[in-house]
Each structure stands twice: as structure tokens, then as C-alpha cells.
């Protein structure tokens, strides 16, 4: 709790006890992604809505998941995603500008949504949880397994990631949160 509260008091979004809006199937915190696009790229969002109506959200989520599967998180955050119906790739984050001269970039940078969520049920196959997930505009960028000094060690956390957090359980579809493109 201390980690989450500290992040929450320093600009991160933290809702206790658990994040209800996490989409296990797509491994995206949907409201943050949609809000980011609506605030940072209102023209792109309006274009998606005019082309797809009530399916605009699904169109965006599917494109993001596809690109995450193909390119990986870092490339998607750095380069954006191709969304059918938009003329150019849609950036999913804005980095702090070296100079604060461009108001539009600064506005998008300030619109970034950083979220910390506890006990994320990530699996499509069971109720396993990851202790902490850090999100940037709805995209998971890091996972953390917490251990106490009294009963567990870092070796326990490493073992848990290696053995209990399989990206592709035997004979099943990959876990989106744990999968990386090959």
C-alpha cells in the first residue's frame, strides 16, 4: 500500500483496493486509453466516431492490442499505432519536450495518465494476480511482485515470474499482459 499511496500522492492515479476497469483479454486499462485519446487527439477520436459510431472504442482497442502483439510495448509507446480509419499513426504517449515552447506537445504531455493498480487478475485461464501493474495511458508498462522481508525473498519473486507467470500456458492462448512479440 505504501508504494501505491506514494505514487498516488505524486501524480499517479491509484484506486484502492483494485482496478475494476482492466480488460484481461486485451491487457489494457480501457478508460485511461480512451480518455488519453479523447484529450490528446480529439480530432482523431472524432474521426473514429464519425466512421465507426459506437464501435469506435472497439476499433481503437483492437488496433492497439494488435500492434502490441506485433511490435511490443516499447515500440507502440514510442511510435504509436496504425488505426484503420485514421490517416496517420496515433501516438499513445507524449514525452516531456526538451523545450516548453510547443503548447500542443506540452498539453499532450500533461494529459498522460500514469496509473498504479494492485492485484490485477491478468489471466484468461485462472484467477492469478500480479501484485502491481504500472500503466501509461492504459498500456501496461511494468509489473511488480511484492515480497515481505519477513517471509519471502527476491528469489521467491524470481521463481514466481519464471514458473507461475507463464506467458503461454501449456495448450492455451498466450496471456496478453505477459506476452512479448517474437
Feature map (PLM): residue ranges:
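An alpha-helical interface "stripe"
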Residues: 1-182
Amino acid at each position: 500500500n505504501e508504494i501505491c499511496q506514494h505514487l498516488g500522492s505524486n501524480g499517479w492515479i491509484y484506486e484502492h483496493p483494485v482496478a475494476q476497469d482492466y480488460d484481461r483479454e486485451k491487457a489494457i486499462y480501457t478508460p485511461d486509453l480512451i480518455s488519453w485519446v479523447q484529450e490528446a487527439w480529439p480530432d482523431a477520436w472524432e474521426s473514429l466516431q464519425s466512421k465507426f459510431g459506437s464501435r469506435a472504442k472497439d476499433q481503437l482497442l483492437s488496433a492497439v492490442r494488435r500492434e502490441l502483439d506485433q511490435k511490443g510495448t516499447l515500440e507502440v509507446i514510442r511510435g504509436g499505432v496504425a488505426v484503420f480509419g485514421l490517416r496517420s499513426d496515433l501516438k499513445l504517449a507524449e514525452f516531456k519536450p526538451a523545450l516548453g515552447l510547443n503548447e500542443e506537445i506540452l498539453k499532450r504531455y500533461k494529459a498522460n495518465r500514469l496509473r498504479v493498480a494492485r492485484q490485477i487478475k491478468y489471466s484468461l485461464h485462472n484467477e492469478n494476480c500480479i501484485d502491481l501493474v504500472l500503466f501509461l495511458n492504459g498500456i501496461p508498462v511494468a509489473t511488480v511482485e511484492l515480497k515481505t522481508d519477513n517471509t519471502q525473498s527476491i528469489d521467491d519473486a524470481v521463481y514466481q515470474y519464471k514458473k507461475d507467470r507463464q506467458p503461454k500456458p501449456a495448450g492455451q492462448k498466450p496471456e496478453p499482459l505477459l506476452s512479448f512479440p517474437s
